[in-house]
A protein has these predicted regions:
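Transmembrane alpha-helix/helix-exit interface in multi-pass inner-membrane proteins
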Residues: 226-243
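Alpha-helical bilayer-embedded segments of polytopic membrane proteins, i.e.
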Residues: 25-75, 102-106, 156-171, 182-230
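Membrane-interfacial helix termini and the short, flexible loops that connect transmembrane helices
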Residues: 18, 22-25, 51-54, 78-91
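Residue-level signal for inorganic ion chemistry
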Residues: 16, 234, 280
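Juxtamembrane transmembrane-helix termini
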Residues: 53-54, 177, 236, 240
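Membrane-embedded catalytic scaffold of the fatty acid hydroxylase/desaturase
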Residues: 67-183, 246-328
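N-terminal signal-anchor/initial transmembrane insertion module
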Residues: 5-8, 12-20, 24-28, 33
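Short, charged cytosolic
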Residues: 1-16, 157-168
């Protein structure tokens, strides 16, 4: 029996969005954001090299850690966007441009992310056979794949929500494993350069206690910032078997497996555009800066054709996710 419910009219919406110019690449604006990140990193070096002269107050290391966290989050979002070719149409160029942000600033593999995210996740969203993200927490979010581990049930809330504080190191480990297994040695070398380039000066010029403070603040703020953004995208949404997903159109699969969040410009900045998840999945190459406009068009289109558009507040999304965990 077919699970399809939506009419096959994605081309109509796509034509409207394209006519509005919202699918056009943004090389200038994208370049400005990339340059801003590099300038911000230079500012970090200036502060680090002059740490003793600046004589920062007691909270100086915390402030530096928070500032670097903002830089790192922007680097994550920029590398995500550029690998989707939102800035430049040329895939090879986009890959090369991602390296300073993905490999050097955050020590992540662009090749791993492209395979895991762009190829598997976007093509087979919430299809457990292909999209490993939906198998989180022992398959708690994919009913047919849900495990039954007694120890996990006992500590499920602590494990799931506690894991949010370790997403960044988990990404690094997965990136290194992928690069080594796939023999991406050039990329691995760039990823390893992260440590002497980013952290070498911090630990050389700062007192050890300050350097450790910067490192810990960044890791324990960056991880939940990213994690609490990522989990709202698809966890708690519909899940399909591979054969079921093949009966759905592109539009129906992406809309039924994704959740967008309400909110304006600040929410859009804070979540790096991931709050417009439905729109990002329908139009992965559409620039992040255009997604709020595309969201309005998509909502109007869904209402016109009586299609469900799944949107919640950020808090509602976390409650829905917690409700699923409760059933594990």
């Amino acid at each position: 029996m077919s699970v399809a419910k939506y009419p096959d009219i994605f081309d109509e919406l796509k034509s409207e969005v394209r006519a509005a110019g919202l699918l056009d690449r943004i090389p200038v604006r994208g370049s400005i954001e990339m340059i801003a990140i590099i300038i911000s990193m230079i500012l970090v070096y200036v502060v680090v090299f002059n740490w003793e002269n600046i004589a920062p107050p007691a909270f100086g290391a915390v402030a530096l850690g928070l500032f670097m966290t903002i830089i790192f989050t922007r680097a994550v979002f920029v590398s995500h966007d550029v690998l989707h070719t939102q800035y430049f149409k040329n895939k090879s160029l986009s890959f090369k441009l991602s390296y300073p942000f993905a490999a050097i600033i955050i020590s992540n593999s662009s090749s791993w992310w492209d395979f895991k995210h762009n190829i598997n996740h976007h093509t087979w969203c919430n299809v457990p056979e292909k999209d490993e993200d939906i198998l989180a927490m022992d398959g708690a979010f994919a009913p047919k794949y849900k495990g039954n581990k007694a120890w996990l049930r006992s500590y499920k809330y602590l494990i799931f929500w506690g894991a949010m504080f370790f997403m960044y190191p988990a990404f690094i480990i997965q990136s290194y494993n992928f690069a080594i297994k796939r023999k991406k040695y050039g990329e691995l070398a760039l990823m390893l350069m992260h440590w002497p380039i980013v952290w070498g000066p911090v630990f050389y010029f700062l007192p050890f206690s300050d350097a450790i403070t910067v490192y810990l603040v960044l890791n324990f703020v960056l991880s939940p910032w990213l994690a609490f953004g990522f989990i709202t995208n698809h966890l708690g949404c519909e899940v399909f078997e591979k054969d079921e997903s093949e009966d759905l159109t592109w539009m129906e699969l992406q809309m039924r497996t994704s959740r967008s969040l309400s909110g304006g410009a600040f929410i859009h900045w804070f979540y790096g555009g991931l709050n417009t998840q439905i729109e990002h999945h329908l139009f992965p190459k559409a620039p992040r800066f255009n997604l709020l406009k595309i969201k309005k068009m998509t909502q109007d289109f869904a209402k016109k054709h009586n299609m469900k558009y799944f949107e919640t507040t950020p808090l509602e999304a976390y409650v829905q996710i917690n409700d699923v965990i409760k059933k594990y």
